């Protein structure tokens, strides 16, 4: 029998953060594609759009007027998914019809007044201000809620309803599914190994290097060994950090650089504004020590072969198990092969 080769043969990889397996089918990477294709926007956006609900000085759909902001701008979402004053749900003893109240708040974070510039096109000082805003919002909301979720949906392909570069922060009175699962599995690993899972993982990736995409003094971005999306990345501090609020000034500044380099490589891969959903996971604000936690950011981009061909999580993946064609190592190699200077800045 031919010896096993992970570049040629189907195999499964285990995700210790979710407890789930991913089917890797590298032999399928060369299959022809005649399916749906995305149409990337070629529109050059203005620095200010008078019809945009998020631009500085404009009036939002509710009639509220945005200030003439110069940096980041945060406001409560006009169509928030959560409310702080939700009444208690009635007790239910039916194991098949369980319900509980959900309280919280949802805020919008405009990254800058410039309607045309996404994260990789912003300056390092502007990116540093965004990180500081993530920190202050997390610290403020963490005083009231156990879970604070900072995230960004970039691009229409990821359901973004407004092209003005922005993110969101939702605070929950409960621990959401993904957070609860990561909490439980990191805690189990810590109990067995006596060290945080993702701190150990960073050391493995630093020693290996084959999945590294970006490295700065204090941060490492890798295509994780267990990646599900084609060019998924995991962004991690090199030392033990529980929450984004715990970063030193040096780690914060280094994070701004890592974000610029990583998102520039994404855009450069297919010479387009690369869509993704990203977000931060850190220790919950539950009054516990949480030494098993390690701060990290997930980037989930859907593009697969080009700016027009995306991956769909359907069929087998919805009903059985996540599957990918490119190996994590091949995806990281492709991201390393492009510049970390944005193609619009380099003049390419």
Swiss-Prot record:
Keyword Lipid metabolism among UniProt keywords: no
PROSITE patterns found in the cross-reference section: GAL_P_UDP_TRANSF_I
InterPro entries the UniProt entry points to: GalP_UDPtransf1, GalP_UDPtransf1_His-AS, GalP_Utransf_C, GalP_Utransf_N, HIT-like_sf
Organism field: Salmonella typhimurium (strain LT2 / SGSC1412 / ATCC 700720)
GO biological process, one term: galactose catabolic process via UDP-galactose, Leloir pathway
Superkingdom in the source lineage: Bacteria
Pathway(s) served: Carbohydrate metabolism; galactose metabolism
Residues noted as binding UDP-alpha-D-glucose in the record, renumbered to the chain: 28-31, 61, 77-78, 153, 159-161, 168, 311-312, 316-317, 323
Obligatory cofactor(s): Zn(2+)
Protein name per UniProt: Galactose-1-phosphate uridylyltransferase
Residues annotated to bind Zn(2+): 52, 55, 115, 164
Keywords annotated in UniProt: Carbohydrate metabolism, Galactose metabolism, Iron, Metal-binding, Nucleotidyltransferase, Transferase, Zinc
First-level EC class: transferase
UniProt catalytic activity: alpha-D-galactose 1-phosphate + UDP-alpha-D-glucose = alpha-D-glucose 1-phosphate + UDP-alpha-D-galactose
GO molecular function, one term: UDP-glucose:hexose-1-phosphate uridylyltransferase activity
Annotated active site: 166 (tele-ump-histidine intermediate)
Textual note on the cofactor: Binds 1 zinc ion per subunit. Zinc binding seems to play a structural role.
Gene name as annotated: galT
Binding site for Fe cation: 182, 281, 296, 298
Family: Belongs to the galactose-1-phosphate uridylyltransferase type 1 family.
EC number(s) reported in the record: 2.7.7.12
């Amino acid at each position: 029998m031919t010896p096993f080769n992970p570049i040629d043969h189907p195999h499964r990889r285990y995700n210790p953060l979710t407890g789930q397996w991913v089917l890797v089918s590298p032999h399928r990477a060369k299959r022809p594609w005649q399916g749906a294709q995305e149409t990337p926007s070629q529109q050059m956006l203005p620095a200010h759009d008078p019809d945009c609900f998020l631009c500085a000085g404009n009036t939002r759909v509710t009639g509220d007027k945005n200030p003439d902001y110069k940096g980041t701008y945060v406001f409560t979402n006009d169509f928030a998914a959560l409310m702080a004053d939700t009444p208690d749900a009635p007790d239910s003893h039916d194991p098949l019809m369980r319900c509980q109240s959900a309280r919280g708040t949802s805020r919008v974070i405009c990254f800058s007044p410039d309607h045309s510039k996404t994260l990789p096109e912003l300056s390092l000082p502007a990116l540093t201000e965004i990180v500081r805003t993530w920190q202050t919002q997390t610290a403020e909301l963490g005083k009231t809620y156990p879970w604070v979720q900072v995230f960004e949906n970039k691009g229409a392909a990821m359901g973004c309803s407004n092209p003005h570069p922005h993110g969101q922060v939702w605070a929950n009175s409960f621990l959401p599914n993904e957070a609860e699962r990561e909490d439980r599995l990191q805690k189990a690993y810590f109990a067995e190994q006596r060290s945080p899972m993702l701190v150990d993982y960073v050391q493995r990736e630093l020693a290996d290097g084959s999945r590294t995409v970006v490295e700065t003094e204090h941060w490492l971005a890798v295509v994780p060994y267990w990646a599900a999306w084609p060019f998924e990345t995991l962004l991690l501090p090199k030392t033990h950090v529980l929450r984004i609020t715990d970063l030193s000034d040096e780690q914060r500044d280094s994070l701004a650089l890592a974000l610029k380099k990583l998102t520039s490589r994404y855009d450069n891969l297919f010479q387009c504004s690369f869509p993704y959903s990203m977000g931060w996971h850190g220790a919950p604000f539950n009054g516990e020590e949480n030494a098993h936690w390690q701060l990290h950011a997930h980037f989930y981009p859907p593009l697969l072969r080009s700016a027009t061909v995306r991956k769909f999580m359907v069929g087998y993946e919805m009903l059985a198990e996540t599957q990918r064609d490119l190996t994590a190592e091949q995806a990281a190699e492709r991201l390393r092969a492009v510049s970390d200077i944005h193609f619009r800045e380099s003049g390419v």
